[in-house]
């Protein structure tokens, strides 16, 4: 019996033993895996492109109109498609191949932000035409963002969701660091329209990289049943019911994201106005300051790579501390006139802002069934963007009526409110973990 007891485990559990030994081999860093590395490279190219085009767009409108309100229209237009179409786009992200959205969006943006500005003469390249291009670009982004985030679980292990999200955000950081600086120099040398024209190539390269990515099919398990197959309207209602009744932590997350978006979108849209009016800076200097924000984002993205072993509640608590630091640094901008001090504050603000999105995406990815991630992200985007468009509008009016200092102070207060919601969300998740 003793020999029988030894032989049977050795013979029947050989496969299991080999499986247990696999984790002992250190996994390859995410950036050096084929599929995630290609996604990261594609995002780097498109984010650098965004960094170049964003400053060029805002500077073009403000230099022509001289109006903070008309400048904020750029930001407002960017938020309309996610608000109106976000939940329904999420339904089709769950139903259709995600590469269709990933590749198609980048090709479409290359045509919009590259080829069209090249084809239109300087005399006919008006602010109204630019508004139209921005609206179509926002539609492409509304399709791309949920497709990208819901693709992460198809190529990355669950334990590395936050790390993967942080690495994806690091491309945003690098885009903010290099994009505006290149854009500022390009605007000074050539002009806004020419910068947009040359920038279209970045989106074509991004599409090429995404074309080589291999996404695993999402296979529903016993605990994650198939949730698609009915009508699109039925799928939409299932996603709404999941957020509203089955997983209310995500509903609180959307509320927190709305508060964050209310302040962050206003800061991003109005920053050229603040820098030009309060500090008297030109496009090159504004580009460098914007790059400082990107440095902070990059540092936080790197820090989050070491937070994957923490519980979800502990990771969410980082939002509380990061938002509080950002809020205080934004308020301090009111009194600081030295450009080097302002650069340090912008790094602090960027670091605080950099914590939110990777952690928030991780909450959605970990608490949502695989076949429903697109719909939940669509609802998340609608809530966040509705708040963002409100923040841009409100602070555009505040800045125009009461001055830039009042606008900055108000944005800082919103970040402090985000810190409160982050603490509340962390406690709610901790209570949920204890209940389980």
Task: Name every feature range the model reports, one short phrase each.
Residues 37-54, 77-93, 97-112, 129-188, ...:
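Substrate-agnostic recognition of the 12-TM MFS/MFS-like secondary transporter fold
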Residues 65, 97, 119-120, 336-337:
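Helix-breaking motifs and short loop linkers at transmembrane-helix boundaries and internal kinks
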Residues 22-81, 241, 245-293:
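Helix-loop boundary and gating motifs at the non-cytosolic
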Residues 4-5, 84, 101, 115, ...:
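C-terminal transmembrane bundle of multi-pass solute transporters/carriers
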Residues 28-33, 48, 120-124, 227, ...:
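Helix-boundary and loop/linker segments of multi-pass membrane transporters
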Residues 127-134, 138, 163-221, 291-295, ...:
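Hydrophobic alpha-helical transmembrane segments
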Residues 1-31, 425-436:
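Intrinsic disorder in cytosolic terminal tails and internal cytosolic loops
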Residues 20, 211-238, 432-436:
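Flexible cytoplasmic inter-helical loops of multi-pass small-molecule transporters
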């Amino acid at each position: 019996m003793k020999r029988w007891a030894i032989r049977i485990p050795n013979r029947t559990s050989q496969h299991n033993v080999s499986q247990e030994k696999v984790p002992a081999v250190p996994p390859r860093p995410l950036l050096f895996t084929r599929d995630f590395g290609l996604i990261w490279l594609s995002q780097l190219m498109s984010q650098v492109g965004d960094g170049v085009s964003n400053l060029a767009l805002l500077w073009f409108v403000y230099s022509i109109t001289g109006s903070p309100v008309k400048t904020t229209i750029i930001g407002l237009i960017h938020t309309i498609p996610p608000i109106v179409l976000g939940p329904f786009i999420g339904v089709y992200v769950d139903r259709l191949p995600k590469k269709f959205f990933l590749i198609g969006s980048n090709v479409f943006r290359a045509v919009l932000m590259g080829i069209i500005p090249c084809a239109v003469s300087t005399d006919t390249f008006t602010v109204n035409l630019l508004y139209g291009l921005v609206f179509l670009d926002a539609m492409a982004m509304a399709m791309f963002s949920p497709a990208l985030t819901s693709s992460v679980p198809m190529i990355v292990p669950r334990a590395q969701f936050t790390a993967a999200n942080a690495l994806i955000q690091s491309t945003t950081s690098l885009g903010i660091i290099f994009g505006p600086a290149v854009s500022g120099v390009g605007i000074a040398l050539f002009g806004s329209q020419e910068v947009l024209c040359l920038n279209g190539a970045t989106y074509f390269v991004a599409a090429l990289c995404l074309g080589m990515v291999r996404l695993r099919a999402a296979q529903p398990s016993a605990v994650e049943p198939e949730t698609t197959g009915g009508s699109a309207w039925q799928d939409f209602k299932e996603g709404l019911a999941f957020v509203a009744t089955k997983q209310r932590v995500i509903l609180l997350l959307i509320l927190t994201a709305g508060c964050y978006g209310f302040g962050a979108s206003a800061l991003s849209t109005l920053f050229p106005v603040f820098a030009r009016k309060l500090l008297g800076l030109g496009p090159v200097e504004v580009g460098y300051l914007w790059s400082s924000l990107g440095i902070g984002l990059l540092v936080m993205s790197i820090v989050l790579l070491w937070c994957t072993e923490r519980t979800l509640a502990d990771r969410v608590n980082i939002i509380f501390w990061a938002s509080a630091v950002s809020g205080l640094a934004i308020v301090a901008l009111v009194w600081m006139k030295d450009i080097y001090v302002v650069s340090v504050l912008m790094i602090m603000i960027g670091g605080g802002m950099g914590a939110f999105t990777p952690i928030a995406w991780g909450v959605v990815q970990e608490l949502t069934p695989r076949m429903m991630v697109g719909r939940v992200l669509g609802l998340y985007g609608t809530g966040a963007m509705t708040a963002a468009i409100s923040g841009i509008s409100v602070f555009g009016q505040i800045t125009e009526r009461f001055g830039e200092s009042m606008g900055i102070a108000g944005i800082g207060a919103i970040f402090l409110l985000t810190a409160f919601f982050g603490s509340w969300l962390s406690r709610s998740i901790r209570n949920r973990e204890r209940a389980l």
